Swiss-Prot record:
Role noted for this protein: Bifunctional enzyme that catalyzes the enolization of 2,3-diketo-5-methylthiopentyl-1-phosphate (DK-MTP-1-P) into the intermediate 2-hydroxy-3-keto-5-methylthiopentenyl-1-phosphate (HK-MTPenyl-1-P), which is then dephosphorylated to form the acireductone 1,2-dihydroxy-3-keto-5-methylthiopentene (DHK-MTPene).
Single GO MF descriptor: magnesium ion binding
Top-level taxon: Bacteria
Organism name: Pseudomonas syringae pv. syringae (strain B728a)
Record's catalysed reaction(s): 5-methylsulfanyl-2,3-dioxopentyl phosphate + H2O = 1,2-dihydroxy-5-(methylsulfanyl)pent-1-en-3-one + phosphate
Species lineage: Bacteria, Pseudomonadati, Pseudomonadota, Gammaproteobacteria, Pseudomonadales
Name assigned to this protein: Enolase-phosphatase E1
InterPro entries found in the cross-reference section: Enolase-ppase_E1 (IPR023943), HAD-like_sf (IPR036412), HAD-SF_hydro_IA (IPR006439), HAD_sf (IPR023214)
Assigned protein family: Belongs to the HAD-like hydrolase superfamily. MasA/MtnC family.
Assembly, per entry: Monomer.
Pfam families assigned: Hydrolase (PF00702)
Cofactor section: Mg(2+)
Enzyme Commission designation: 3.1.3.77
Amino acid sequence: MPIKAILTDIEGTTSAVSFVFDVLFPFARKHLPAFVREHAEQPAVAQQLQAVRDLAGEPDADVERVIALLLEWIAEDRKATPLKALQGMVWEQGYNAGQLKGHVYPDAVDALKHWHQQGYRLYVYSSGSIQAQQLIFGCSEAGDLSGLFSGYFDTTSGPKREAQSYRTIAQAMDCPAGDILFLSDIVEELDAAQAAGMATCGLARDGGALAGHRYVTSFALIDPASF
């Protein structure tokens, strides 16, 4: 079956891992405590703070304890959904203030634009929240790229290393798994997508190999029609 849709990871794929770890995470770590204290009563924030309490098994945790938990989770790089949501809110504030610009590799920008023009439906699947994904592409160094994408998926669709997550996403895309090309730099994610029936292509930007999958060093080398 010809490829009709392309589902891409962000970290290490469209964007530098260093942007996430050296720019976004430190920004969130620095600004999260004040943001939570300032906005704790707002419904959207309060909902996420309650989710932190539930996840930690500490239903009576006060705001300062919740902040301490969030900072622990950041240090551990935990993929906790409420942490991701709150980080997204802090990043949105930073992007809107012009303090942050999303990093997207130039080869990824060019390829995504080209594929969009060719009629491929483009989607994102990242461990970062959907809001954070939209900000990286909507406020990127290359301008607003959000119009290229038909949809975004995060860990609310399931863990990235489990095949069922990719089946769930294919259903949500209303597209047979065999018509979807998944791009990632993590072999376990590629394995899971492949097990769900998707075509896969690995991004090995620093060289190296991604065993069991076709892989390239740049988006410029990906031809969806060849899968």
